[in-house]
Regions:
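PRPP-associated nucleotide enzymes
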Residues: 1-104, 108-173
Length: 173
């Protein structure tokens, strides 16, 4: 599924602003205090969404760098794309028990990144308002996994299947 020309390599800012408006419409009554994403391709979407909520964006880093001096919340993500596990970190300075967090990301497939972000929120003692996903690969099960945990997941596009024969088949919303 190639979306790199407008979403996660080159960004069509006008389009992503519209995504942000839609996430705001869906979650505006949730009293969001922070938007959380994971580097790298979720950052642009999260930032343009955050402008409508007027809240900061926190992104989980895939490596702990020397400029993160404070204690951190940590979780492990399995990347099916890169076929490896990696740790993600968020400074305890930027996520705490008073936060009501909206997770924003470009894709949801098997749910590994999303469940790791949920772990960071839980470790901080914060509340999860939900997750806004641009494209959910419903056939990989991550969305149902997270919904079964009681988390509200709003996907702007849900793909039922992808095949050479039928192309991309979207779920009926």
């Amino acid at each position: 599924l190639k979306v790199d020309s407008f979403l996660n390599h080159q960004i069509d800012v006008s389009f992503v602003c519209e995504l942000g408006k839609e996430f705001y419409r869906l979650f505006k009554d949730e009293n969001i205090t922070k938007i959380l994403t994971i580097e790298a391709s979720g950052i642009g979407i999260a930032c343009l969404t955050a402008q409508y909520f007027n809240v900061p964006v926190v992104f989980a880093k895939k490596t702990k760098t020397i400029n993160i001096y404070s204690d951190t919340y940590n979780a492990t993500v399995h990347s099916y794309t890169h076929k490896r596990d990696y740790d993600i970190v968020v400074s305890k300075d930027f996520l705490n028990k008073d936060d009501n967090v909206l997770i924003i990301d470009d894709f949801l497939a098997k749910g590994s990144a999303l469940t790791a972000l949920l772990m960071l929120i839980e470790k901080a003692g914060a509340k999860t308002a939900g997750a806004g996903i641009v494209i959910e690969k419903a056939y990989q099960g991550g969305g149902n996994l997270v919904r079964d945990m009681g988390i509200r997941v709003e996907s702007l596009a849900k793909i039922k299947s992808i095949s050479k024969k039928d192309g991309i088949v979207f779920c009926k919303q």
